[in-house]
Amino acid sequence: MGKDSKKHKKERRRERSPSTSDSDEERLQKRLAEQRSLKKDEKRRQKEEMKKNESAEEKRARRMEKKMRKDAKRKDADAEDTLIPPELNYTNLNNPFNDTKLTQTFVWGKKLEREGKSGLTQDEITKQTSQRIRKNLHEAAEFKRIRDSRAAAKEDMEMMKRDADLRAGQISDTKEREFQMDQIKERTRIRIDQGRAKAIDLLSRYARFADENPHTAKIPDFELENPMEYLKASCKSVDDYEDLIEDIKTYREVDGWAKNETWWMDVTRIAEDEIQKKAAQNRGDVHASVQTEVQNMFKNKSIDELLKLEDQMDAKIRGNSGNKGYWQDLDDQLKVFIARKRLREHHGRVLRLQLAIIKEEQKKEIQQQESEELLPVAEVPPQVKIQKEEEEEEEEDEDDEKISKKVRRKIDVQTLDDPELDEPERERKWRALTGDQLDDVTRELYRIGCYSPTYISADDTMPGIEILDEQADVDNLTERRNRNRGTLPSSSAASSGAPQGASSKMMAIAREGMEADESIFGAEEQLAAQRHLWSDKYRPRKPTYLNRVQTGFDWNKYNQTHYDQDNPPPKIVQGYKFNIFYPDLLDMTVAPRFGLTSCEDPDFAIIRFKAGPPYEDIAFKVVNREWETLHKNGYKCQFQNGVFQLWFMFKKYRYRR
Amino acid sequence: MSGVLKSDGLEIAHVEDDRGVQGEAAIIDVDDREEYFVKPLYTYYCTCGEMAMISDTLINRMPKRERDGARVITPDRTTAKTFAKPGETVYVKRSPAVGLEQQYRKMCKKCSIPLFYQHPSALNRTFILADALLSAQEVGGFSGNNEEQRAKKVIMKRNVKNQGKMGSVTVSTMEGEEEEEMEARETAESYTMNARIVHDALKRKGIGSGKFAVPQTPSSSSSSSAAAAGSETPSVKRKRGTLL
């Protein structure tokens, strides 16, 4: 390489000399050439002297140094084309492959021959190889960039998807809640249609109607009743009221909390008051007589006055003046009173609106009829005036109950008995009627059917026949029925109150010979449901009874040792006396029977008495011990005069040591 | 007590007729469903407990007479059978402007209280005196056959199988229960039976080991009644609200 560069320099010099024609420059050139040749000769002389003087080791070091300098030069010249990474620090002399041409470009001779490129020089081969390698590296970098961008895009898509899923999850919760609210409304409608509505269903229907139709001329398809009637009819116990309060909260969530706020709060307060009443809690520090006076004070006052009174009471409670418990309790009662009064007034307003609508419709009908008769024009104005005056007078005097009667929906009787209507539909319509509606419908049916009998004049009857007075006849029948119902059986003789004649005789027979050691025994054992073939014809019932338990001391060895007459032992059951009354037994010739069965407690047994119709079986739980069955020991088993008597004592065991 | 069907809905095909290809036994399953409405019968009693009337209509749905509150049994819209013996003929004085009403009264077979009456002009109509009859619930007591049932829809399923020479027809009116539910219920019942048997066996062993215990002195009547009453288990607080 060095020789080639020297040749290059010489060629350049030769090229320059013919172009220069100046003599001065020629002289400078000659002098420079001479000086250069002199320096070279000196250097050559110095080298030869050093070579002569140096030792073998110095010679080896010099040569290594020279070679390394050459390698460094070559390395610098080929720095751009070097393929070995700089971290490896591999050189031609220092590499684990023992390859002295490591830094040179590999030449694949046979391939070049095959491709017809054997004429290329080393520089060209190196250049092509470098270009190919650079292109490959560039392509790899391009692929890496594409892969990274694709991964980043995928990650972005995943992030967006996750956000969308989160948002959708929140929406699904909301939709679930909305679905439940819709189902509540749907279930309410179904319960009302099927005639098994709850209090919350009726209240919500009333609230929705009163809210949606304040001035619309729409007649409701149900009977407008006072909301308090819904509460009384549906809610029977504390649990029902508590359920109602929760249901009201749920329904306000369905319809929106702001709708009918005052109305719902009033209903809730009344329900809470009913809960307190049924729980029989103490009403505070107010005496019972004062409560009546308080209620009278609240009456005959408008809602505004009551609200002012409430403010005054709140001020007194806050000011701690007087008896705080008294004012607190009074304030609670006042709130409930205001709620009830407000509900009543609201209902009155709704009814008056409905009445006005109905009257408008009636006026329209009258006008239509009058328009058909146009001839008597002169008579129309005075009639209208008279009607207006009458209506004004009626409106002032009417009460809420009268208004509700007028607003009451007229029932189409023909629809209920329509033969084309199928059975389920008819049954549903009948069941939807209230008590008053049912009464009206049945009276209308009687009138339509023309069931009234023909009446006879008093003159047409025979002279001596007995004529019953209407009221006297009714009274007589009622008395006989009550006497019949009075003899119905009760669960025990003690609760029968005033027994009748026959019962008193039976009672006397049963109580005969009662001693101080005996007490009335009335713990009846509950039997499973009994079914008899005759239960369709006769009303099954339980017989009445008067049973006694015989108690006394048991002077066994243990008790003789530890007790005496002054300090007696506890009494034990020594016997039973069952007296069961069967006054209405159909077949008096067959006596009742009894049987013993075991029960869970081995110390006790169940004795069961069985008789014929119309009496059901009756059972008692008795001590499980052996009976004495001899008459002289108190055993008695007889059925006489409608009284079944079973008396027995338990056996006593005595032994001698 | 359900009403009898007027039309014969059980047209059972002759199962031996082979409807398939001749020579080959064809298995044919025919599933048929028929819905009809069951109206229950209501039993009414006299105040003494004697059965007085069976009707397919509730008393409070019969036409009501304004004058005395009686109800009318009309043959065209009510089917009812009365159980009563003939009573006396009575002339009831209504208001002076109206006149006298002649009634043929019928009495209870047991206590002889008048329950029904008829008029000479229309013997096909029977009137029920007001407050004379009591329903099963009003009389009180328990009777499995007389609970006032609501009118309900009954689904009758008819399944016809025809397998050549053999065939079977299954008619079922079970209320909406399918075979799977029946099998599940039978399995549960068998489990219950096994549990009861095991319980009895354990109890028997317990009683056997009890022989060596010291026998207790029999207690008095008050303690026996107290033992019979037993202690009440504290009830778990129930969730409030019925809508959700």
From Swiss-Prot, chain A:
User: Would you tell me the protein name for this molecule?
Assistant: Splicing factor Cactin
* Example of a GO cellular component annotation carried by this entry: cytoplasm
Q: What does this protein do?
A: Plays a role in pre-mRNA splicing by facilitating excision of a subset of introns. Plays a role during early embryonic development. Required for the distal tip cell migration at the end of larval development and for gonad morphogenesis.
Residue ranges annotated as compositionally biased, kind Acidic residues, are 389-401
**A GO term, aspect molecular function:** RNA binding
Pfam families found in the cross-reference section? Cactin_mid, CactinC_cactus
Skewed-composition ranges (Basic residues): 1-15, 61-72
Which species is the source of this protein?
Caenorhabditis elegans
Q: Which residues form a coiled coil?
A: 23-77, 352-403
UniProt keywords, alphabetically? Coiled coil, Cytoplasm, Developmental protein, Nucleus
Low complexity bias spans = 489-503
